[in-house]
Amino acid sequence: MKENFNISKLKNGLTILTYNMPYVHSVAINLIAKVGARYENEEEEGISHFLEHMAFKGTKTRTAQQIAEEFDSIGGYFNAYTGYENTVYYVRVLSENCHKALNILADIIQNSIFADEEISKEYQIIMQEIAHHHDNPDDLIYETFYNTVYKDQPLGKSILGTAKTLVKFTQEHFLNFIGKHYNAENLYLSIAGNIEHNKIVIIAEELFASLKQGVTSSFIPAKYIGGKGFIHKELEQTSLVLGFECTSYINLEKLYQTYLLSIIFGGGVSSRLFQSIREKLGLAYVVGSYNSAYFDSGVFTIYASTAHEKLELLYSEIKNEIIKITETVSTEELMRAKIQLRSNLQMAQEQNSYKSEEIGKNYSVFGKYILPEEIIEIITNIKADDIINTANKIFSGTTALAIIGPNDLNGF
């Protein structure tokens, strides 16, 4: 409900967003920095993610252990994650501990010291994360896919960075990156739960007073390229990711048409890919489709794994299903997909962790809060012809293909 949503801007420009949910006992806090991996230059690759790791490693007044103990002492859950377009720090605590949680979070964002010994330790941890990532075929194939689709662009680089760049980062690098991107205009504090907006504003005015004004960060526009990427790896199965360019998240009508297409095509056990590739032909245990959207680009992906000798047949059957969905979509299929999408959206509204992230990301991207009712209306108005037209536009575009397996795939 719109009346539960409030927004204020502090004197320094920090945006405060709250959504009151009086029936819950907790609050979910998100501090969203509008900076991620695609904002990095070549020398900075991986610094957004590294910085997120360093956020809980000590401030001017708290050691890493004290930060952990203070969060535990208020029964809080805290973590952070880095994407291509933002970095999110989130906390969930009982409403009575909201002030204390904000105090710690504000200290982390404004006063982290990035001690050399902590940088060295975290470097080793991230290198282990990268090694784990490269040992996982699913992670590796998607990394290869994005390297191919957005070749030589920040959106095609790994969020984790590389040993070549990570090993060079010092306290100075982190402080410079913070100074450049972690300013009041580039941060959004969003809170959902049993809270009062005016009290949150007063608390935030006090705790985030030292944030400098600054400007919103910018990035180089993405250019979808397509192409093929192959990785030779001794595995029990061969996996493929087939992709096409699709809409960004700025056009909501096109975005939700693409979501519905993905659900119908490969989004669940009743989807066409699942029923054809797995249930009817037995070609794959895992098969599905998904669309990823960014500010100025998007990718529709189809993923499957199969026995090495069945790869060509699998690929052929996927292409057959692509042809079919560009021709017909039934009323029943569309209705099932709409119910799935609406159900997921409406059930998520009951979770304050979802609401906190939703209002923060909405405002950081669109400059406004998009009501769930607006989204539901968009979904409701989509017709079968819209899905067919979307499928034709997407699948007539330049193909991108990534394959990982033990065989020689260069002739594929």
Swiss-Prot record:
It comes from Rickettsia typhi (strain ATCC VR-144 / Wilmington). This is Uncharacterized zinc protease RT0210. Keywords: Hydrolase, Metal-binding, Metalloprotease, Protease, Zinc. It holds the Pfam family Peptidase_M16. GO terms for molecular function: metal ion binding; metalloendopeptidase activity. Belongs to the peptidase M16 family. It comes from the Bacteria. Zn(2+) binds at H49, H53, E129. It is an enzyme of class 3 (hydrolase). Divalent metal cations. Binds Zn(2+). Its cofactor is Zn(2+). The active site is at E52 (proton acceptor). Its EC number is 3.4.24.-. GO terms for biological process: proteolysis. Gene3D superfamilies: Metalloenzyme, LuxS/M16 peptidase-like.
